[in-house]
Amino acid sequence: MSLSNNQTQFVTVFVPIQLSIDVFRKMNNINSFVNDNLTNFPIVTVDQLIKVVNNNNNNNNNNNNNNNNNNNNTSISNNGDINNCLATFEQVQNNCFETCDFKATEREHYFASGKQIQESVLPEEEEEKISVNNFAMVTVEPNNCFVKAQQINSVAPLSLDNRNCVRRAHREVNTFVQVFDVCVFNLKVVNVATNESQVNLFNGGNVENICFDRSIQMPRSSADDFDWSSQQQSSWYSLALSIIPIYHEIILVLCNWLVVAFYKYWQHQQQKQLPPHPLNIIVPNVSKRIAVNLNNQLISLTFTNFLKNIFFLNNNNNNNNNNNNNNNNNNNNNNNNNNNNKTNNNQLNLSKEICNENLNFEEFNFEDESVCKYNRLTNSCENISKIQQVNEESELLDWFSDFEEMDSVLLQNGTEFDNDHPMVKSQAPSITFKSLDQFIKYLEENNCVDDIEVSPCSKSHTFNRPVSTPRLIIKPTWCVYGDSLNTEFFHSCLKDKTCGDIIVDHFEPLVSSPTDFLLSNGGQRILDTPNAGGSSVWSEVLSFEVLNQVFGAQLKKTETEIEYAPGSKITDFSVDINNSHIGVSVVRIINFFDLNGRTYKAVFTPEYARNLLYKKLFGVIASTEAVVDKWEKQILYVWTTSSCVADIIVQEYWKVPAKLRSNTLVYVNHATNSEFLF
């Protein structure tokens, strides 16, 4: 395995370092200590180690020079004093093993010098003693990113969990101590040496998922019989350790895929195969090409077979049987006899058109793809050469032309819609009644004025509703409360496109000024968009906010964005509720109560409520008929200042003719402390 040399990679690792006891004392200013208290000392960092090494340079010049001569190929300058630094590292017998800082599920093995080392692997695990194994000891120079390995004896493995267990370990008081540090290495070159020979395993590149100790360590089991004196054996073994996990995953994926494929094949074989049945189908060839007898043959009606221009006819035996059956049916029923004779004549005419003058037809042989020309009079069969290759493009066009001819026949009965068709006219924007008087006159002429049928859905949309508990919906700047079944009735009415309903809720603002309302994107869009005139902008904004926050409506078009036929009634905005296009008209009842003086200016009578409902419901019907982008239903949103007014509106709503109520949902909000709405 090799990596590119033109990139600089950084890796965060846990580095265990073995220090002599003298160095450890000097770094921590300790004169003496006991084994039990050794783990309570602070962690020794690499920077502290380098500082101690630099302080000891003057005392170790001779040893440093000797060690530099033995390690010419492995030393790299460390701030101008790498020789002294490297020699001191070897003098204190530091042992550094790096592992990548990434999530690992398996246990990593680290090593320290000594015969037996006792260490706690995890807080919940027991301490264990591991026997001595051979291992390649690694020395790391952190600042220069250089790694070298030496084969030594009497090295015991330490078992540590990756990332989570950074521990201090110790052997004997008078030898050396192993401490851990977290370092960031600029990894450029990683060399492994065995018996003064170097093998370049890694050379830069991406080190995201590489654990380097796997590539440079010896076997994790006993390897006394393995000859590590050979450089090639060491490199090949290291390379194998890095490749085996990859092939292991590939083999698992392939095995899984083979098992699934075998199971699907076995399941397919277990399915029962249907036996072939003869085809007794008569299909005319409108283009008057050959007709093929496929009786007692099994063929799938696929697109490829249509490209070959294969159609089906009954043979003589089946024709005789069908004629006998038809004769029996004719004896039983004279009416059926005439119909069957007509169908038989039509079939004979089709057969005469398809077959030639000598009553010849051609039979297709599926085994060798040849055609047999058969003469009915002489009962002779003449083999013809294999069917010629046809032009697939022309055959495809002819095939679709046959269907076009069939469609033209079907549409002759009036199923083809043009612009004058009633269904097309109903979808086009129009104005049938220009005023309420015309609509009432139409109701009187058709005896619909007294038709006050509640609804075709008497169980869901009636004034006889069950008693239920109240509900309260609180938002940051307003709240709505009313019957707990109102939400259910609201959505149920929207789903029913044939009838209307009326629902009453109470609205209470939680702020004193309308500018303090927290608006949704749709509400802010209505507020910022100029309307068609009037001072009802806040009533429209809050109407949408209630529909959005309580019933899940999403704004589709504002008042000026909706298109109508010229001279029609208009709607304030349209919304989308559960993928249904709904129009919304907003009405305010403000002439009967003095909000500032808190007194009634006039009495809201049932007659006024009835006239108001007639006028507004007619406007809803007119705008629905004249709108270009058709909606499925419309909501008449009514704002009132008194609960008495809301009660009167509910009573008079059910007295309105059913054709005027149409499928409009009337939603009444009794608002208090909402002078800005009116």
UniProtKB/Swiss-Prot annotation:
GO cellular component, one term: membrane
Low complexity bias locations: 55-73, 318-346
Region (Disordered): 55-75, 318-347
Keywords: Membrane, Repeat, Transmembrane, Transmembrane helix
Membrane topology category: Single-pass membrane protein
Location relative to the cell: Membrane
TM spans (from-to): 243-263
Principal location class: membrane
Additional note from the record: Several proteins derive from AAC-rich mRNA, which, due to a frameshift also have ACA and CAA codons and thus are Asn-, Thr- or Gln-rich.
Protein name: AAC-rich mRNA clone AAC4 protein
Lineage, broadest ranks: Eukaryota, Amoebozoa, Evosea, Eumycetozoa, Dictyostelia
The gene coding this protein: AAC4
